[in-house]
């Protein structure tokens, strides 16, 4: 299916990763209902989840963490502070409330 929506957020202050993740989680829940974060990227530290997902991607257009999430049903990307942080989500769908 692939990503069907991208939301851009600006988070004020210097709350770092925790503040960005909290804001992204809220935006994702408002858009998808019950959902889970399948992947993330932190530009400042170069940290991504799943770890090392982009290492084998070289010059590919799509980062490894994004491809990982999309291939597992993710449909929403939340970009915080102009790409300082990226979080990718999927709805729990039939698993919601279980």
Label every PLM stretch briefly.
Residues 39-81:
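Exposed beta-strand-loop-beta-strand "reactive/processing" segments of non-cytosolic proteins
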Residues 5-49:
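Short, non-transmembrane alpha-helical segments in secretory-pathway proteins
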Residues 1-2:
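Contiguous hydrophobic, core-forming segments of folded domains
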């Amino acid at each position: 299916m692939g990503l069907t929506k991208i939301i851009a957020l600006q988070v004020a202050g210097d709350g770092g990763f925790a503040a960005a993740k909290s804001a992204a989680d809220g935006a994702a829940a408002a858009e998808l209902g019950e959902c889970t974060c399948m992947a993330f990227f932190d530009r400042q530290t170069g940290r991504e989840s799943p770890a090392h997902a982009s290492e084998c991607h070289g010059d590919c257009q799509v980062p490894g963490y994004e491809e990982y999430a999309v291939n597992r049903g993710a449909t929403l990307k939340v970009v915080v502070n102009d790409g300082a942080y990226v979080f990718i989500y999927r709805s729990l769908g039939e698993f919601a409330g279980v």
